[in-house]
Amino acid sequence: MAGQTVIVSGLNPAAILQSTIGGAPPSTAAAAAENGDTTRKVVPLSKDALQDFMVSIITQKLQGEKKPFYVLDLGEVVSLMDQWNVALPNVRPFYAVKCNPEPSFLSMLAAMGSNFVCASRAEIEYVLSLGISPERIVFANPCKPESDIIFAEKVGVNLTTYDSEDEVYKIKKHHPKCELLLRIKPMNDGNARCPMGPKYGALPEEIEPLLRIAQASRLTVSGVSFHIGSGDADSNAYLGAIAAAKQVFETAAKFGMSKMNVLDIGGGFTSGHQFTTAATAVKSALQQHFSNEPELTIIAEPGRFFAETAFTLATTIIGKRVRGDLREYWINDGLYGSMNCVLYDHATVTATPLACMSNRVNLNCSGSKMFPSTIFGPTCDALDTVLRDYHVPELQVNDWVIFPNMGAYTKAAGSNFNGFNTSAIVTHLAYAYPS
């Protein structure tokens, strides 16, 4: 297995890992240490050995403090990039840093050719600290503090989004060389779990005035951006949004503006079947509306597509209560921590038991009686309830509960409420080769 080679965008994963981890700049190590992760060792293993790897980490913790931890499977990231390049070869991914800014994850994406969209000065600083050049960053926040615009000008981030008159004036004043993408509101948000339309995007009647204002301010509008919303959106929403973007291109040409050369189709991609149907819809719409634009650069802002399935969270049972047939468990992470995704991202989490203390011979308790169970987070707020009426085998304090698919809007959006420090959760690195 050590000699196995997987090619991603012409890169050898062994070389990627060396440049990502072993050859990381000091700033990467500093960022990792700041996040409670001082080890950058990558463990190669087979795809079906991820649980064994987690058990080995847990075994090391049995005599010490049993803190939650993540495992990042870099092999999954490689597989996802392969899928992207096959399905959307002409669409360049700009990873949405807000989704999960884990440093080794970002470095891996960068090594495979991904660029980045940032929403704030802090995110730009973080990406730059990893040795990524400012030319690979889009400041994709339509409403920015003036201080952040000044910073973007200083460090050379020269592409941003706008959807209001005031934003044009701020950019004209503080960063006049910055090129603009007009953010438009899709008329169909695709029933996304997290729609973006209520907050961002120019309405149809606002597009011409916003183009005119930018033109009068002598700013360059290089293209159009949109976002259909995040999480399980209807892929057909891309069809209408791309058609609307084409109309903006035509309007700008009618006004005598510089030829637009960038189309940003936003995010909303989820790995699996949704991505397949979304990619088909995107390619169909691009063929219909932009087939005669050979100079056009098409970009997207995937976040959860790359992050969600690459991370697995391990938590410890710190308390238990029995009420008849009901089992109630307390774990050491919850809705104020990594599981904030249940509230704010409308996620559905699944739990897998690892009876590392009570049943080491049968870790997953296969064949055991199942009990209706409630799983609480560690804080004193009753809202901090991760799962209700969830059937799991009988578990004990110091057993573990594993949560797969925990990479999207989890640790990145957690808090330190009640003194439970989400930012201190360690991430261990693995590279699982396909079975």
Curated annotation (Swiss-Prot):
GO biological process, one term: putrescine biosynthetic process from arginine, via ornithine
Record entry for activity regulation: Inhibited by antizyme (AZ) in response to polyamine levels. AZ inhibits the assembly of the functional homodimer by binding to ODC monomers and targeting them for ubiquitin-independent proteolytic destruction by the 26S proteasome.
Record-listed substrate binding positions: Y344, D345, D381
Binding site for pyridoxal 5'-phosphate: S230, G268, E301, P302, G303, R304, Y409
UniProt-listed InterPro entries: Ala_racemase/Decarboxylase_C, De-COase2_C, De-COase2_CS, De-COase2_N, De-COase2_pyr-phos_BS, Orn/DAP/Arg_de-COase, Orn_de-COase, PLP-binding_barrel
PROSITE patterns: ODR_DC_2_1, ODR_DC_2_2
Assembly with partners or alone: Homodimer. Only the dimer is catalytically active, as the active sites are constructed of residues from both monomers.
Protein name: Ornithine decarboxylase
Species annotation: Capsicum annuum (Capsicum pepper)
Organism classification: Eukaryota, Viridiplantae, Streptophyta, Embryophyta, Tracheophyta
Gene designation: ODC
